[in-house]
UniProtKB/Swiss-Prot annotation:
It is found in: Cytoplasm; Membrane; Early endosome; Presynapse. It comes from the Eukaryota. Highly expressed in brain. This is Endophilin-A1. Monomer; in cytoplasm. Homodimer; when associated with membranes. Associates with MAP4K3. This interaction appears to regulate MAP4K3-mediated JNK activation. Interacts with SYNJ1 and DNM1. It comes from Gallus gallus (Chicken).
Length: 353
């Protein structure tokens, strides 16, 4: 910096101190200018905080955000492609559900249901990734550009104007000691800077409908996300309801213990057992129908709910007398006749065609 430049900086600093400490009054700016300056300052602070809060809204885990930022920075330094995206909570939940759904298998109700919901969560995570990209492209990036370009430019103009104001006020206090031309030039420079700053602030505030459009893009992106999320959740809800209906329509299975082991204490003779004297007790054959006539064995208990139905217990042998239709048999048990559902029994001797 030249000697003249250093001298000018010293004069500005002297004027600033005299205003702050000594109570000297500087050139006043008009109310319209100060109001525009206030609105620009609020806009600048709003843009910074809203960008930060939007990122927190989309990516709520601070540890994951920090890790992702570090990975992307390292990838950029190494000249690699952009690293992995933010790990959505829905994707993590989907992985767990799909894993245990596979482990449980198709033989139970819970396993396939876990797989259904896991797939839905996976779809939700993909829709959430789309939301992230949409909001970044149409909301965060434009705000970042507004901050880095327009607002920064305005701050530069205001700073330059303030420096020229201090220079003008310093020279104005020394009017008579300085050439009039020097004072006139200082005033012209101050007015010029004030006009540029005022014009840039006016243009920014006048075009704030652009920020409204960016807000609209944010809301539209969220609306689209929630529409797709609703469709995904409705589909999986329908699947789960179907599974519940199907399971409730199935006959209730009763636990039937297997025959217990017994010890054979007999000695002598040919022992045909090869397991150290341990044998399994045999289940007695249920009394009921003769096996040389059409009959069936009850797989479950059946409680008659309507007149004409035949009740029985699991394991009962029922004599078959007739097939009413594809869903019902007619049979006899303990001297009583009635109807019962086909899917409750296992055919031992079929009815003749």
């Amino acid at each position: 910096m030249s000697v003249a430049g250093l001298k000018k900086q010293f004069h500005k600093a002297t004027q600033k101190v005299s205003e702050k400490v000594g109570g000297a009054e500087g050139t006043k700016l008009d109310d319209d200018f100060k109001e525009m300056e206030r609105k620009v300052d609020v806009t600048s602070r709003a843009v910074m905080e809203i960008m930060a809060k939007t990122i927190e809204y989309l990516q709520p885990n601070p540890a994951s955000r920090a890790k992702l930022s570090m990975i992307n920075t390292m990838s950029k330094i190494r000249g690699q492609e952009k690293g992995p995206g933010y790990p959505q909570a829905e994707a993590l939940l989907a992985d767990a559900m799909l894993k245990f759904g596979r482990e449980l298998g198709e033989e139970c109700n819970f396993g396939p249901a876990l797989a259904d919901v896991g797939e839905a969560m996976k779809e939700l995570s993909e829709v959430k990734d789309s939301l992230d990209m949409e909001v970044k492209q149409n909301f965060i990036d434009p705000l970042q550009n507004l901050h880095d370009k327009d607002l920064r430019e305005i701050q530069h103009h205001l700073k330059k104007m303030e420096g020229r104001r201090l220079d003008f006020d310093y020279k104005k206090k020394r009017q008579g000691k300085l050439p009039d031309e020097e004072l006139r030039q200082a005033l012209e420079k101050f007015d010029e800077s004030k006009e540029i700053a005022e014009s840039s602030m006016f243009n920014l505030l006048e075009m704030d409908i652009e920020q409204v459009s960016q807000l609209s893009a944010l809301v539209q992106a969220q609306l689209e996300y929630h529409k797709q999320a609703t469709q995904i959740l409705q589909r999986v809800t329908s699947k789960l309801e179907d599974r519940i209906k199907e399971a409730s329509s199935q006959p209730k299975r009763e636990y039937q213990p297997k025959p217990r082991m017994s010890l054979d204490f007999t000695s002598g003779g040919d022992n045909t057992q090869h397991n150290g004297g341990i044998s399994h007790a045999t289940t007695p054959k249920p009394a009921g129908a003769h096996m040389d006539q059409p009959c069936c064995r009850a797989l479950y208990d059946f409680e008659p709910e309507n007149e004409g139905e035949l009740g029985f217990k699991e394991g009962d042998i029922i004599t078959l007398t007739n097939q009413i239709d594809e869903n019902w048999y007619e049979g006899m048990l303990h001297g009583q006749s009635g109807f019962f559902p086909i899917n409750y029994v296992d055919i031992l001797v079929p009815l003749p065609n």
